[in-house]
Every structure is written in C-alpha cells, then in structure tokens.
Amino acid sequence: MQVLPPGSTGGPSRLFILRPVATTLLMAAILLAGIIGYRFLPVAALPEVDYPTIQVVTLYPGASPDVMTSAVTAPLERQFGQMSGLKQMSSQSSGGASVVTLQFQLTLPLDVAEQEVQAAINADTNLLPSDLPNPPIYSKVNPADPPIMTLAVTSNAMPMTQVEDMVETRVAQKISQVSGVGLVTLAGGQRPAVRVKLNAQAIAALGLTSETVRTAITGANVNSAKGSLDGPERAVTLSANDQMQSADEYRKLIIAYQNGAPVRLGDVATVEQGAENSWLGAWANQAPAIVMNVQRQPGANIIATADSIRQMLPQLTESLPKSVKVTVLSDRTTNIRASVRDTQFELMLAIALVVMIIYLFLRNIPATIIPGVAVPLSLIGTFAVMVFLDFSINNLTLMALTIATGFVVDDAIVVIENISRYIEKGEKPLAAALKGAGEIGFTIISLTFSLIAVLIPLLFMGDIVGRLFREFAVTLAVAILISAVVSLTLTPMMCARMLSQQSLRKQNRFSRACERMFDRVIASYGRGLAKVLNHPWLTLSVAFATLLLSVMLWIVIPKGFFPVQDNGIIQGTLQAPQSSSYASMAQRQRQVAERILQDPAVQSLTTFVGVDGANPTLNSARLQINLKPLDARDDRVQQVISRLQTAVATIPGVALYLQPTQDLTIDTQVSRTQYQFTLQATTLDALSHWVPKLQNALQSLPQLSEVSSDWQDRGLAAWVNVDRDSASRLGISMADVDNALYNAFGQRLISTIYTQANQYRVVLEHNTASTPGLAALETIRLTSRDGGTVPLSAIARIEQRFAPLSINHLDQFPVTTFSFNVPEGYSLGDAVQAILDTEKTLALPADITTQFQGSTLAFQAALGSTVWLIVAAVVAMYIVLGVLYESFIHPITILSTLPTAGVGALLALIIAGSELDIIAIIGIILLIGIVKKNAIMMINFALAAEREQGMSPRDAIFQACLLRFRPILMTTLAALLGALPLMLSTGVGAELRRPLGIAMVGGLLVSQVLTLFTTPVIYLLFDRLSLYVKSRFPRHKEEA
C-alpha cells in the first residue's frame, strides 16, 4: 500500500503552485463571495429552532373555570385533536378565559398549521356558546416566548381608556403589520366602554329586573341595514338614529313606564364612560400604563423585526397627543447585539492569538503571513456558503468560527512547516513547495475528512437540539473544508514565492533564543520518549487508567441542559391566597414593585393584574423586570434574583417566583420557575388526591428549590342551589336564573357601539358598592309567570364552597404542572433523578402519568442520546480513517488518543464548577477531532519512513515523533488559543460560550502531554499484534 503520493510531484497542489495568478484570482473570488455573503446574513441570538406554535384565546366574561372548560375548551380540543402534525396540545381554562396552545412537529410549516387551526375553529362554531362576545382568536406565537419588545404608554393628562383607544387604533395595529410580528398585546385592559351599574333596590322598587333593563338597552342600540329607495330619477339611502354613542345618551334611555311616567336608565343605574373590564390593570414603574408586548412569529428574524418597529415608532408617536408618552422598556435585541459583538471580538482575538503563536514558532514574518492570510480567507469564505444555507450570524455560528480559527490554521502550519524543512535542507523554494506539499497532501486530506467525520453525528441529532446545532456543525465543517482547499492551493504557492533559505535562516537574538529553547524541549522529549518506549506496559497502564478515569468522571460530573443566560430581563409571577380579589392584588403588586425598584440593578419594571388569557387567575400577577446593562451593574442575574426574593419575602401573603428570560424557549406556557414536571390523570378527583402528596414529597427534596404547582382548587365559590320545583311553579327557568346572575355579576357585554374607527361595548352589572360579597345575591330578583318579581332567595339557597381557579389540560386530559428551580450545588441531572426516585417511592397508580416538560424533557432526550452521539462520532471517524489508510489497525491506534481528551475536558469542567451541558458535550466531540491529529501526523510519517527508508517500526515512530513534535505542538497551541477567548469570556452571553472553551482548553492541555507518549507505544503494540496475526493466519495467494 502506498500511503503518501510521490513527494516530488506536488500531488494535488502541483497545478496551483505552478499557476500563481490563477490561484490568486480563485482565492480572491472566495474572499469576495464571503464579504458579499456576510452583508446578507441576518443576525440572531441562536439558530431558528422554534416549534410551529399557535395560541387560541377565547374570552367569555363572567364564565367560571368549569363552564369555560366544558363549553369552550373541550369542544375546541376535540377539533384540534384531529389535526395532523400536532405534537402537543395544552389548555388553561380560568374565569372568563380559555387558552389553547398547539405545538406542531418541527417539519410542519407554520402556514399549513395556521390553515388547519382556522378550519378547526370554523368547524367548531356551532358547538360554542351562542353569546360569546367574540369568536376564538388565534395567533402564531409561543406564549412562553418572552416579548421581543415591551413598550409602556403613559399619560398624566388623559384617562387610560382614551390612551388605550388611541394606542390600539394608531400604534398597535401598525406594529402588528410588521413582518415577523406574531402578536401585539395591550396589557392593562382599559378598553373604552359604557358601563351601566344597576341599583338593585331602585329596580326592585319599580318592579323591574335586570333582564328588563338588558332587553331595553339591546333593543335601543342597533346598527343594521335599512335599505334604500330607488325612484325614477334619484336613489335615496335610508338611515336612522338607531345608534347611541355616549353615556349621556344611554342615561336618558327610557326603559319602562310607571303610571304613565317614563323610567329612564339614569333613574335606576349609574351610567358612565369607563373600561370594558374593571378587573384589569397594568403599571410601568408604579405608574398606570398601557403596556404593549410585541411577540414574534416562530422562526421570524428577531433583529429585523425589532429594527422595523424602531424605525416606525417616531412616526407613530407623532400621531399621539403630546401628553401621551411612549417608552421602550425592554428590547431583547439590545442584548443579542451585545452578545454577538462580544463573540465577534473573541473571534478577532482568537485570530490574533493564533497568528502570534505561528510567529513564535516560525519566527519569520513571510512564513507568518502565509497562515495569517489562510485563516481569515477560510473564515470569510464560509459566509458565502452560510447565505446559501439560510444560516444567520448568531452565537453558535460565531462560536464555530472562533473554534475553527484553531482548526483552519493547522493545515497551513503543517504545510508550511514541511516545506520550510526542505528549504532549510537546501532545496529551491519551488522544488521544496512541490515536494513538501506532495508529501503532506495525504495528511491534510486525512486530517480534514476525519475531523468532518466527527461532526457528521451532530447533523443527525433529533428534535430541537439537532436543529440548534446543525448550523454550528455545518459552519465548522465548511470552514475546515475551505481551509483544506486553501492549504493545498494558496499556502504552497505562497511558500514557493515568499520563502527562501535566506529568509528562513535570517535570525535575530529573539529567534536564536527561541530556537535554542525549542531544541532543548525536543531533546528532552526525545529522552523521555526513549524511556517510555523501553517501558511500554507502564505507558499502556496509564492509557488504560485514563480510559477508566474518563468513565468515572462522566458518571460523577453534574449534568445540565443549556447554560442559563443573563439577558438582562427577569420574568416574574406574584402569587397570593386563592381567594384574593383584584383590589387586594393591585395593592400587593404596589408593595412588591416598591421593593423591586429600590434594587440598584433594576432599570424598569412592569406589572400586570387580572385575567386576560395570558394571566390565568386574579390571585396572580405578572412582572417583567428589566435590568441595567451588564457593564452598569455589579451582579449577574442570578444574584439579582436572589436579592429581590429576599427583599420581597417580608411582605405578608405573597410568594414571588422569578426566572431569567432565555434565548432558547422550548416550553409552551409561562412557568413560575425554570423547569417543569407534569402530573396527569383521567379525572380532576384523581389529581386532587395525588397533587398534595407529590408536591409535599418534591418540596422535601434538597435537589429542588421553589417547588410550586398550578393546581388551585381552594378558590371561593358561591353555589346557587335552585329548588327546581319551586322555580317551575313560579314559571322561572334555569336560563332566567343564569341570565339574572350574569347581568348582575358577569360584566356582561350586552351591546356594541359602532364608530368609524373602532367598536366599543356596553357593559351591564349591579352596583355592589353598598352590598359587597354574598349579600349582593340577596338583591337579585326574577320575573315570575304572573309578571311580578321574586327574590332569588325564594327559590334558591346560597352555599359557599371551594372550586378550582383554573383547569388545565394536556392532550385533552386534566394535568397539573409542577415548577421548580435547581439550587446551587446541584445540577439538573440531580433534580431529574431525585424526581424519578420520588415517583417510585410514591408508587403512583397506572392511571396517573408523569412527564417532564420543556427544557427538562429536552435534557432527558439529549442525555439519553449523548453517549450514542459520541460513539457515532468515533465510529464515523474510524470508518473514514480505515478507508483512507486501507487498514483496520491504524485507525485504532489513532483513536486510542481520545480518552485523554475526555479526561482533560471533564476535569476542567469540574474544577471550573461548570456542568456537563449540551455546549460542553459539543466541545468534547470537537476534541475527538482535534486530538487525533497528533496521532495522524506521527503515523503518516512513521509509515512513510518504514516503506521508503526501510526503518524498523520503533525507529520509524521515534523519528516521526521528533520530526512532527514542533508542528504538533504548534497546531495544538493554535487550537487551544482559539478556544481560550471563549473560556475567558465575560461579556453578554458568556454563559453560553464559556463551557465550550473550558472543555476544549482542558482537553487539549491534558491530551497534548499524554498523546505524545501513549501514541508511539500503542502504535508499536498494534504493529506487533499485526505481525502475530499475520504469522498465525498467513494469506495464501492463489495462482492464476
């Protein structure tokens, strides 16, 4: 077998060495394509990996959670459950609101999912309540995805109802039209309306009921077609004063006559301009506000979307009165841009460090310029390919390019070092370039394809993690491939034109000192290697111990999913007792806001109270805390969270749950804390039995903190127990009872006011100021068969009970979600294992199922596939090396270096206090590709020496180790310095980059020392083994 091509021909590099102009123009084309491509690449935090997600919201004011579940959510779920491509369906039914979240398979286009959802809603129309104020509204948005931008609209001169009306018609609609915007929500609920507050005593004294008033109002305010008159010469359109537009007009409405005298609405009710829902409120830095949350569509370019919004904001705000102020409270793209800038700086620093190492070893400016050109050319050329693949400039692709800095320079170094060796021996530069490039060409190809083989398994990772790292793997592979092309074309051509004996031998004092140092190091290495080769079994024992240590460290190291990022935004949930009213929650949020705004790291705060589809219950409030930029505060987000929770802990009757927002959102619902675990049953009764038991057990685990659940079954409910026989005798139906209660206490939307710009509601309710609580039920009167009025108490008893505040479903079955954080000193892997052990201890029945959700579920899937991923990388590399070497043995020798990389990486992570997460695992897989380079360079030269010079295997491997020591050391240090800026990263997004750098630097440091000694010993071991096999099983040639 001929491993290396003839050294004097130049191999694949010959044509490019002899045609410098063509080579230069080809490289210039690659450079130009990359520069143009860079300008077209979008900027993002991470690759787009969102599941196609659609949220369907139905509002039914006054309906209880039970009614919302049975009348609205269940019919919708049955229709949605028939859709193809649906991955998961979750729903939350609370007082007056139903929210169904549909998550589809990654392969299903969002537009197709949208059509399916619209068709399902249309098919379900006849099954939904006839008096729904509005049909179900769907939006292409993941509710768990934090808004890309939050704006607060305030005014010190106008009521919030007018402010919301202007914002909705002049601002929100325009922002909704921006490409990439999925949903614009107005938190604060101050939509203008005419509110009619009935005086129960007044209408009772007149013998009227709330139903009489409702009928009168709906009949007096209509907006329908009236036709037209078409005469011989003229056509006349018919119109009438059938609409009432203001509270004044409604106040004057005659609703009945008593003894011939008119009874006007103002006589029995307070009629005023107000808000459609008086139990909603939002505050920005404690000031009443309308808060606009802008959410993107799954898959949309967040940077482009935010830029478009900012460009149109000045024009939109000009259309508002001067007393209305629009403030951008948060913009996620600010941190995304800062993170990308920091990563770009680290990329530039890595290039500078790599070039510095090259100069330190070569000590020659022309020799340093050559790889100094090859590195940026390989990286810039990658941008052209990224454009065609629809990639983006994001943290992962920039990390890939930063790591590639150390990879791509390796090829150039190997070529330059080999050509320089021949020039120093007296060869002419052109002949040396042809001979050196031809001799090293196969090594370059081996290094390239074996390294790309390591990345192949990343391309086949499933689900969202696979999508996430596909851009990383492909970007790195493309950079490596372009580097190999550059190293076999441009690099030897430049060596032939720029290097000479004079330039290489020209030395100053620094050069001579470095040369003496390297000579001493190589001599020391030679003496050490000779001793190691004389004691092979001791070296093999060290190699075997390294393998065992790798396995042990893999078992004991804390495991996580994805680094927790500091993006400068904290999401919060404020929880109060289940019987809390809107007024008490508004008071509590004011107390909490005051404490939060006192923290020096907090820049702004928005809070929201009320049920609107996004916030499920009245006893909870949502918060968004925007921190100052990272360079303007002393603490990271986790320290700020701890400090805020301590500050709020002294406020009685509230629990505050906080979590930092993340760029990677896998969940489908807003959770109180970072991780979720669900308990599902076939009935609510089964859930109510097991939820307290499991929650108590989880709260006792030291591996979990801030454990809570969304199970709330202790809300106060007034049960109206109607005596049906008595009601029937009086001619009162259950529909009459429901209507009376709804008219009084449901903020019932009974009529619509149409204007040229918008539509507004008329809201009917009882004025309960003088009769609060259950006493208000005593004022309800119903119309009997004889036309008289009957108090509700005549046919019903009122009982106070407990009832759920919300009912949650997962795939149509009742479910409870437990939320938890992981305390310091424990990992997500520890928490997951503790929960699984608790499940076994409790011995849950067969009809109770549990499942991790969101990032915890993704962690389980990723952890289960990690070992197979590494095995697949090793197998892929073995296959490629076996094909290249036409040998079963030599690839094993090369792969024997891998355990050293694992030991170094795992030890470095443990010392640094980092978890073994997905980012660190990618670093270990990349180490597999880097570390085997040392063995490839040694073995290639040893095989050549055996074949061409007739040397013994021991002498050949000894000479190869000494000859390749300098390029091995140079390439390893280049790769190490390429990863060093990531390890030392401190800026925005550093949490994401640091584990990769730590794993690679640690792995390279340990493997560099060990592989220089273990590889030659293992090479000789397998050589002896090969000879033994050949002697025992000789191959007999058949004669023709």
UniProtKB/Swiss-Prot annotation:
Indicate the principal place this protein occupies in or around the cell. membrane
Annotated membrane topology: Multi-pass membrane protein
Q: Where, by residue number, does the polypeptide cross the bilayer? A: 25-45, 347-367, 369-389, 396-416, 440-460, 472-492, 537-557, 863-883, 888-908, 910-930, 968-988, 998-1018
* Compartments (UniProt record): Cell inner membrane
Q: How does it assemble?
A: Part of a tripartite efflux system composed of MdtA, MdtB and MdtC. MdtB forms a heteromultimer with MdtC.
HAMAP family, alphabetized = MdtB
**Family recorded in the similarity comment:** Belongs to the resistance-nodulation-cell division (RND) (TC 2.A.6) family. MdtB subfamily.
The protein's name is Multidrug resistance protein MdtB
